[in-house]
Amino acid sequence: MFISGRRTADKWRAEERLQCPAGSARAALARCADGGAVGPFKCVFVGEMAAQVGAVRVVRAVAAQEEPDKEGKEKPHAGVSPRGVKRQRRSSSGGSQEKRGRPSQEPPLAPPHRRRRSRQHPGPLPPTNAAPTVPGPVEPLLLPPPPPPSLAPAGPAVAAPLPAPSTSALFTFSPLTVSAAGPKHKGHKERHKHHHHRGPDGDPSSCGTDLKHKDKQENGERTGGVPLIKAPKRETPDENGKTQRADDFVLKKIKKKKKKKHREDMRGRRLKMYNKEVQTVCAGLTRISKEILTQGQINSTSGLNKESFRYLKDEQLCRLNLGMQEYRVPQGVQTPFMTHQEHSIRRNFLKTGTKFSNFIHEEHQSNGGALVLHAYMDELSFLSPMEMERFSEEFLALTFSENEKNAAYYALAIVHGAAAYLPDFLDYFAFNFPNTPVKMEILGKKDIETTTISNFHTQVNRTYCCGTYRAGPMRQISLVGAVDEEVGDYFPEFLDMLEESPFLKMTLPWGTLSSLRLQCRSQSDDGPIMWVRPGEQMIPTADMPKSPFKRRRSMNEIKNLQYLPRTSEPREVLFEDRTRAHADHVGQGFDWQSTAAVGVLKAVQFGEWSDQPRITKDVICFHAEDFTDVVQRLQLDLHEPPVSQCVQWVDEAKLNQMRREGIRYARIQLCDNDIYFIPRNVIHQFKTVSAVCSLAWHIRLKQYHPVVEATQNTESNSNMDCGLTGKRELEVDSQCVRIKTESEEACTEIQLLTTASSSFPPASELNLQQDQKTQPIPVLKVESRLDSDQQHNLQEHSTTSV
């Protein structure tokens, strides 16, 4: 068996020598050594491999002699080299072939299906013990074994293509270029220096030092000193077949990170400056001293900006109270942002001929035809406190002014941003008066739950998001004390804060423009009241809160079994936050009388603040002169409460129809911190756009209720106390003045109250407050807090004359 295997190998080797030239003997020998015998038969060829060393040396000598002839030919350029030059011979030749002939020192040669090895620089081969080199300066060119004589082309030698290996990936090599004497391009050196090399054993680090030595000799640039030793950098092939080094990725990432970080650093440092004309001395930007302002001269050599100087002169004139012509808004003042509608409103001044005409703006709505009066607190900030009071008097006089038909000229008047000094209403009462009882509706239900304002504040805070909250609205509470079924309490500190505004001080139910003379603010039957609305929104059925009360089951079982297709609409419920058209009034029955109303709006924020005030209400107001037509068209029941006076909602289609019939209206959007005034006989409807806490009250103006009528009301109230028996004492409260006297002294005090032109008694008798003594027409309202039996006696003597 052993002999037959050996004969078979000898026979195969003889056939290979006949078919292949001497140049391909080593390839055949390699195939015979590795594939010709398996297992114990492999040792037979070890001795025969040594016999082939001489033939290999002859082949290498012949290749070295043919190289000068090939180099003498015309060489192509680096970028236009033929494809055969790019592919280089395998590393299974030369010294590795000779090493294979010594089995005691080196392992046998790897099979021919391994990767090809690329040699980038055609420098001299490193000296070896077994392979003698041909003397001479000529560098041997490594060529692949030539093909058989029948298939060899006449042109230059081209490497024979090998079958693609099954276990290793293909590599794409850069074109082989011969380095010329002289300096090279930096990119060329980088490409050769960082190229991937492998040794004869497949280890990329085995030939690293030799290649570095070659670079040093070829370039000729680093002849002295220690050569720089750098580890070969790794290359990663991309999907297009191109190679990219790992350091390129790192550099790209660093550049991207630096750019991004630079943007983030510069993002928050931009100063908000709108114009050079609004930069004041306080900002340190104009560099204008006070001496220059007083002299009124500009030095041309100082390089001052004329526009900045003009603005500062105008600003100084604004604060000097110099008169009507000089009192104006500085020409350089520009608001940060305003809508087109607001810009058109501010551009229209109301020519009243007074000192404050530039601060009053009149809007004539083109769609509805009604007039609206506007004032802006950012413009009024230039006014002093005394001038603010005078402006508020003039503004309110225009607001409630009427024509010969007793119809107001303006459908609405707004002071934008006038309530900015007040705290958030809901936060104020939740933290200062947490146990105040309130009535809270369940969202989307008709149930009412009684809770504390602190608990309501917690629910709003938990469900608030982006301007709305998903909890039930809070019904109105009284801020001047609860009567009968009302909810609320008396909050004198909060009322004092309201009176700090000159607009509210005159228009509160006990204000200077009111016809009522209340000795105590808790006696007011006209408010103020406060309520909170969540804003109109669509609520998914899954988010709808469940009622705490049990519902009765429907008696009709067929309705429960009926199938209603959903089509494409989601299952959600519209929560309407609307107050239909109504007219504010006082009195009941024959005493019904329309009156004016005042409101203050504070948006529910919970930490979401913005530069622009948020829109809270969408309001439609009809002109007071069209009061009768609107009542007939909308079928209002004026004797009902405001919530139930009208059964239909007035939308755009209805407004257009009413406008064609000659009815005028105004459509306004009220924002956070706005104070609005509605004259009498103005029918209006509200829609809550976002979560808002509102204050509102009625005011009985003096022009609506003459002094004679107020005096008669005071006489009737005094008549009620005339018939009371029993002893009454004089008590003075911090807020209220209660007049309690003996029955014998009642007639004298009634005469005092009914006679407006009589002299006022000294303060020592009635212990009146100082501000009441200075009033020109003192009218005192007698307050009686009686028991049930005393109230019965009061009704019996109500018809008694004075």
Curated annotation (Swiss-Prot):
Histone demethylase that specifically demethylates dimethylated 'Lys-20' of histone H4 (H4K20me2), thereby modulating chromosome architecture. One of its GO terms (cellular component) is nucleus. PANTHER family: LYSINE-SPECIFIC DEMETHYLASE 9, ROUND SPERMATID BASIC PROTEIN 1. Its main location: nucleus. This is Lysine-specific demethylase 9. Residues 210-221, 232-244 have a biased composition (Basic and acidic residues). Residues 123-151 have a biased composition (Pro residues). Residues 152-170 have a biased composition (Low complexity). 2-oxoglutarate binds at T579, Y676. It comes from Homo sapiens. Its EC number is 1.14.11.-. Binds 1 Fe(2+) ion per subunit. There is a cross-link at K290, K313, K740, K781 (Glycyl lysine isopeptide (Lys-Gly) (interchain with G-Cter in SUMO2)).
